[in-house]
Amino acid sequence: MQSFMTGAPGHHIQSIKKSTSTRLVYVVFFLLVSIVAYILSYWTFSWFNNLDVLKICSKGDNECKGALVVYRLTFGLALYHILLGLVMINVKSAGDSRAKLQDGYWPLKILLLGVLIFVSFFIPNSFFRVYTWISIFSAAIFIFIQLVLLIECAYSLNESCVRKIEDEGHSGKKWYVLLCVLSFGSIALAVAGTVLMLVFYGRGSCSINQFYIVFNLGICLIVGVLSISEKVREYRPSSGLFQSGVVMLYCTYLIYSAINSEPPGTCSSNNTSSPKESTIIIGAVFTIISVCYSAFRSSDSTELLGNHNHYSSIPTDPNAETTGVADDECECTAYNYSFFHFTFACGAMYLSALLTNWATMTSTDITSSSTSSSNSTISVDSGMVSVWVKVVSSWVVVLLYLWTLIGPILLRNRVWD
């Protein structure tokens, strides 16, 4: 499969790294399953009605059927990466026989993914009553990974712009302008979003929404001011308004998403339990970006927090010109295989929670087949689980960013990249 993607020998194309092409294939797998899950979460086909596991849904309840289908698709994908992650534990050398499984045997791995998804449609619904809560817990872990990647990406972009400004001298002013536009633009959008949320969601006696919105704005502004303080910049020169703006904008989105996940009531603008399309689309985009970014990271993405565990690589491969694939793992692995698959597994379960609006199954007996007149056993967003996961996540991202600012001051002997 890699030779198909990178070109056959004899074609004059630029070679790509073997580790990159491998991760690209896994990303394609994830994207394909995600697209299918998104489509089936809204539209189910007539042949789904013949599946016994979907007969617990009332006739015409496509929301119930869509949720059950999404659970099974994402479970198959998550189990696929969990199994591969377990097999790849402690693989650090390309000489390890297990490394060949990571980079090859694609027909076998495609078959494995298909079989796992197929078999999941025959697993009793009682299992998925538990799986919904496992997916919520794993989704929270993936949100944490997203937060780390977001802050890391913001620092990387800021340092890249600053480097170009210094290297290009007078002609580098365009990068300075770009950095200023992105910094103040992010802050302006976050403030505007906060004002709009107060107008539409914080009116009247909705004190809980007012608390979410105002508290989020307050802590973001405090950390933003701290990021440009003299003491922080002395030990963390790369800190600045750009990272603060990105964090502030993302936290504002999380609060917006949390409020839109509230059950129908006096403080919710939704008259139904269905989530707003905008929150699902934005969440899906963040998921795909996070998965892609984490996939092409060279290590386990913990350097930002002060923990260094680099994975070396040997980029030189004499066969690259003829094969189209440069073997950058001649001796050491270019990335942590287990962490890679762990991230994808959590991403799959986060996708499950996202597409079903963090749905949970009711406590009714879902193991027995019901008639077409039975009520749906899927309760979509019946509680405040998703609300608090997102609200707490917004607080965690601020704390993580705060740690990157004060960490170098408190732990001066540790290297902070």
UniProtKB/Swiss-Prot annotation:
GO terms for cellular component: endoplasmic reticulum membrane; membrane. It is a multi-pass membrane protein. The keyword Transmembrane helix applies. Keywords: Endoplasmic reticulum, Lipid biosynthesis, Lipid metabolism, Membrane, Phospholipid biosynthesis, Phospholipid metabolism, Transmembrane, Transmembrane helix. Disulfide bonds: none annotated. GO terms for biological process: phospholipid biosynthetic process. It is found in: Endoplasmic reticulum membrane. The chain crosses the membrane at residues 25-45, 69-89, 104-124, 131-151, 180-200, 208-228, 239-259, 276-296, 339-359, 391-411. Pfam families: Serinc (PF03348). The keyword Kinase does not apply. It comes from the Eukaryota. InterPro entries: TDE1/TMS. Belongs to the TDE1 family. Enhances the incorporation of serine into phosphatidylserine and sphingolipids. This is Probable serine incorporator. It comes from Dictyostelium discoideum (Social amoeba). The lineage of its organism: Eukaryota, Amoebozoa, Evosea, Eumycetozoa, Dictyostelia. The gene is serinc.
